[in-house]
């Protein structure tokens, strides 16, 4: 009987710039894979935000982190993929048959913005729901913007990102790519 009720896979999209991907993002990804059958980590090109890392670099960093999650057994390869997008989020969700948008919330200020976005998205495509996941206590204050600022000023970011991401930040800032932080 359960097999008869089984519909097509529930696809979720976790969008972001991931500039860079942080431990907070990874926490949301791990938890989101428990909610949906297939999670697409959607890396926004979003040149308007002036990213430190190019889109292909951000996609590569996220893919590398997903490989680690898979290796650790936190998820499996069939449940997650990483794609870049540069169009309206709702159009992207429609193109991948997603029915859920995953968003992480750290603070009340996040909620206000995300609440407005969820309302706009619901108007654009009422069949796609937005699901909010509260940041874990240890991750509540992590933001990519703060990580870049700390890294740019020579601070230790190892409590906020994985070692490979920290190394990429160090390389960027050693080359003088500081204008975007």
Question: What residue ranges belong to the model's regions?
Answer:
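Nucleotidyltransferase catalytic core that binds NTPs
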Residues: 1-181
């Amino acid at each position: 009987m359960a097999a008869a009720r089984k519909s097509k896979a529930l696809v979720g999209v976790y969008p972001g710039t991931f500039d860079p991907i942080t431990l907070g993002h990874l926490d949301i990804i791990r938890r989101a894979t428990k909610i949906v059958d297939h999670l697409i980590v959607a890396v926004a090109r979003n040149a308007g935000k002036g990213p430190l890392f190019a889109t292909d670099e951000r996609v590569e960093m996220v893919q590398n982190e997903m490989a680690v999650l898979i290796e650790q057994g936190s998820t499996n390869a069939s449940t997650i993929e990483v794609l870049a997008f540069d169009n309206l989020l709702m159009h992207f969700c429609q193109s991948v048959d997603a029915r859920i948008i995953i968003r992480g919330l750290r603070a009340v200020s996040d909620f206000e913005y995300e609440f407005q976005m969820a309302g706009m998205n619901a108007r654009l495509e009422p069949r796609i729901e937005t699901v909010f996941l509260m940041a874990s206590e240890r991750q509540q204050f992590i933001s990519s913007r703060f990580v870049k600022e700390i890294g740019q000023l020579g601070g230790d970011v190892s409590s906020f990102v994985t070692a490979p991401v920290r190394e990429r930040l160090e390389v960027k800032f050693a080359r003088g790519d500081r204008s975007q932080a």
